[in-house]
Amino acid sequence: MAKKQRNEIDWTDEEEEIIWVSKSEIKRDAEHLKKLGASLIELNSANLAKMPIDDTLREAIELAQRLRLEARRRQIQYIGKLLRNVDHEPIQEALDKVENRHNQQQALLHKLELIRDELIEQGDSAINPLVDEYPTLDRQHLRNLIRAAQKEKQANKPPKNYREIFQYLKSTIIEQN
């Protein structure tokens, strides 16, 4: 019987499950980790402190934030390499939470703009449901702002009260949330 070489794989062994990973898949994973590293570099120090990363990775990210151009690119490569050695899923989840908080704030501001436009178009009929939903709103102050914004719109004046309605809604509703 021929002697089995040390590096040769025994294809008859059924107990061992061999998972083949293509070179392209390895490259895609490495590219994904580099993008994750680049996203971490863009975070400010407060958000970076919330990330579940070790000290070596944190120092590499802080160094990359100070570097420019080619040195930064090489540092991102290095951060990607460090990310290959750690479980990157908790880091990705924490990053998604930080980015999603920004998206939630943008959605809230967009909602406030729609509420403001609806208030100006419909007047008093739109105030009651809004005050029911947000009881901290001052109904009389809101009516005065809406009336002034409607007059500005008819007279083609600059939208001072239009912006003031938005600021009032923003300060009151965000404070309540």
Swiss-Prot record:
GO terms for biological process: assembly of large subunit precursor of preribosome. GO terms for molecular function: ribosome binding; rRNA binding. GO terms for cellular component: cytosol. Its main location: cytoplasm. Keywords: Cytoplasm, Ribosome biogenesis, RNA-binding, rRNA-binding. It comes from Glaesserella parasuis serovar 5 (strain SH0165) (Haemophilus parasuis). The keyword Iron does not apply. This is Dual-action ribosomal maturation protein DarP. It is found in: Cytoplasm. Member of a network of 50S ribosomal subunit biogenesis factors which assembles along the 30S-50S interface, preventing incorrect 23S rRNA structures from forming. Promotes peptidyl transferase center (PTC) maturation. Belongs to the DarP family.
